[in-house]
């Protein structure tokens, strides 16, 4: 399709619904009605797949279904692939993963951009359900060299805001929560590193302290490459799986699979 053809179809759709479906900006974004239409299309596509499986003659192309899912980088770097690998292979499913912080992933679903998401919020958007899968345990870690430089006499909480931290991105408030738990409410020095793997490598290199998933740092903790800056002060972050209520059999099966995997 040409750009002019796409523009014409959008105008025809807007004439039909009687209002704009797109905000003409850079980049463009859907209006509230546009988001409702996107959500509807997501659900209809999943329901169509159910029908094609029941009536194979309708599936002329025979292509795998693609699920667009928002999830946080730490889940992707640790447990996600192992949890869904067999399911995707057996169901012939491709995934289109959108990496967002666990605090904001739900915005993608509300905007109609994804069929499901993992996030830290329990409250689902309209037309969706949420399921608690469990919690990711984070520990505040640093390299022994970092601790020797910044805390030569031992850890002092009041000095933590003046030592470099590592933050995943502007929507990552985990370090803020940790500092608040120690009575520190002011701003703090920090690097920005939008990569879960890079976050861990920067911590290992002594560039700063950071909250790292326990799952991701087991080897480093066991070898002494990383240490807790303050012993036994973990933060548990709940993980909720959000999915459309009318998302079809495939999404329901994936939800059941994740529920069963989480129970193990």
Located regions from the model:
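Flexible hinge/capping segments at coil-to-helix
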Residues: 128-166
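Helix-turn-helix DNA-binding motif, specifically the short coil turn and the N-cap/start of the second
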Residues: 1-5, 9
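Hydrophobic hinge/microswitch elements
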Residues: 110, 184-229
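Central regulatory/effector-binding core of bacterial HTH transcription factors
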Residues: 63-126
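Alpha-helical linker/hinge and terminal dimerization helices associated
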Residues: 16-17, 37-61, 258
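Secondary-structure junction motif
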Residues: 161-185
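A late-sequence structural motif
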Residues: 231-264
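A short LG(V/I)-centered, amphipathic sequence patch enriched
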Residues: 12-32
